[in-house]
Regions:
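PLP-dependent class I/II
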Residues: 1-247
Length: 247
């Protein structure tokens, strides 16, 4: 789908495996920042990043790590952009069931202008609290899955048969499990928010995923540090592990 000299638009911050995968294909990522505190897509900025070499845009909703969720209007903007420039869309939807506060996950597969040019990726590992399983799937039109199959065997060969049977058996036993995920993680988010209430750390809104962003600018210990430095200090000084937004 992409090759030597092609460009792929990726928003920042983003899951750190996108960039290496693009570079392995001989293409390069063009990074478009999502700005705090909302981290919403700025479609004008995305359009400015498109060049004659652009072949694909990668989107992730709910988004790791900004915790934002693309709206139906966002998907329509994406559809217009992809149609105007004949772009493929790789949609990372592994957190599809982890949306909160009335937010709704909108898949690219549900948008008529996107379904024919998109690959949507899903994960049972994320949905079933077992990321080590590495069990997932991709939905795309036949011409795109043909290209996917050309490389899939050499990337993963296959998913362990026992794990596939385990997931199938679990879903047959608990067909309503996905409906329990949002309340489960909402309770976890509330516990973290209440634990940090009254501290100098400010929780930013989290509409989806199992991540939460923290504004530490008011902290005397951390306020002057960048995110990587702050993560190191938190770990070494107080034994709290965090993940910086910087790649």
């Amino acid at each position: 789908l992409v090759g030597q000299g092609d460009e792929v638009i990726v928003v920042d911050p983003a899951y750190d495996s996108y960039d290496p995968a693009v570079r392995l294909a001989g293409a390069r990522c063009v990074h478009v920042p999502l700005l705090p505190p909302s981290f919403r897509f700025d479609w004008d900025r995305v359009r400015e990043a498109v060049t004659p070499r652009t072949r694909m845009i990668i989107v992730n909703s709910p988004q790791n790590p900004s915790c934002t969720v693309l709206s139906r209007d966002d998907l329509r903007e994406l559809a217009r952009l992809a149609d105007e420039h004949d772009l493929y869309v790789l949609s990372d939807e592994v957190y599809e069931h982890l949306v909160y506060d009335g937010a709704v996950h909108c898949s690219v597969l549900s948008e008529p202008g996107l379904a024919a040019r998109s690959l949507a990726v899903f994960s049972y590992g994320k949905s079933l609290h077992a990321t080590g399983l590495r069990v997932g799937y991709c939905i795309a039109p036949a011409p795109l899955t043909t290209e996917l199959r050309r490389v899939h065997q050499f990337n993963t060969f296959t998913i362990a048969t026992a794990l596939q049977h385990a997931v199938a058996a679990y879903l047959a036993e608990k067909p309503d499990v996905f409906a329990t995920l949002a309340p489960f993680f909402t309770a976890k988010r509330r516990l973290l928010t209440e634990g940090l209430a009254g501290s100098v750390l400010r929780i930013l809104p989290s509409a989806g995923t199992y991540f939460t962003l923290v504004d530490y600018s008011a902290s005397e210990m951390l306020g002057t540090l960048d995110d990587t430095q702050a993560a190191s200090v938190l770990l070494e000084s107080v034994g709290v592990a965090s993940i910086p937004l910087a790649p």
